[in-house]
Amino acid sequence: LPSVKDVYVTMLPGGDYKETADKSGDLVKKGFNPVPHFPARSINSESELKEYVLRCKDLGVKQVLVIGGSREPIGKFDSSYQILETGYFDGIKIGIAGHPEGSPDISDSDLEKAMIDKKPYADYIVTQWLLDPQPIIDFISKQSVPVHVGITGPLKISSLIKFANIVGAKNSINFLKSNFTKALDLLKPKDPNDLIGKVKSHTDYFHIYTFGGLKETNKWLKENNYV
């Protein structure tokens, strides 16, 4: 892992919360600050949620990221707000998800309402990753808590377009297609330095989505003296 403090531990749809908690505990022992995901729609029941939170606390976890997660709920929880209002996260630093470019799974109006509902519980917001700086700047200006801007590690343009389509980052898709149209451009790796330069006066925090490219991201972080 790169020489960073915070390491987010994902819980994919169908994943085992015990495994996510235990991996987080291992990271605590190695000196990291693990931030396990709590995807509401992937949690079976309130008792499972309580057990997941308590297990994380017992293992030394101090911070979590609460998200909606998969499209279809497997239990009683349909939104991140529903697990936030249980009160089980008291005493833990809470991050919530932000979507400056919208989401393919929810309308813009419902997304705005969800943010209003969640924000009283949030210590900070982690955004989806994106490439167009203006939606990020506009989003940050409306928030009352710190915003951790989602960026990618170095990736080929073709890969960025693929992942942008998956998360529904509309502005970023248009940004990529308008700036990188040649076939050779699509094969070149792109790092987020330009984006960081344009938004760093608006935030002190960045959240890196490596998409499996830990080595490349670690190299980029060191070459740019970010760690």
State where each predicted segment sits.
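Catalytic cores of alpha/beta
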Residues: 46-55, 108-115, 119, 136-141, ...
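Membrane translocator/pore-forming domains, dominated by Gram-negative outer-membrane beta-barrels
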Residues: 114-116, 120-122, 126-137, 146
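Active-site beta->alpha loop and helix N-cap motifs at the rims of alpha/beta catalytic domains
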Residues: 1-112, 116-117, 122-123, 181, ...
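Charge-patterned, long linear interaction tracts outside catalytic cores
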Residues: 204-216
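Active-site pocket-lining/capping segments in soluble small-molecule metabolic enzymes
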Residues: 76-102, 144-195, 212-214, 222-226
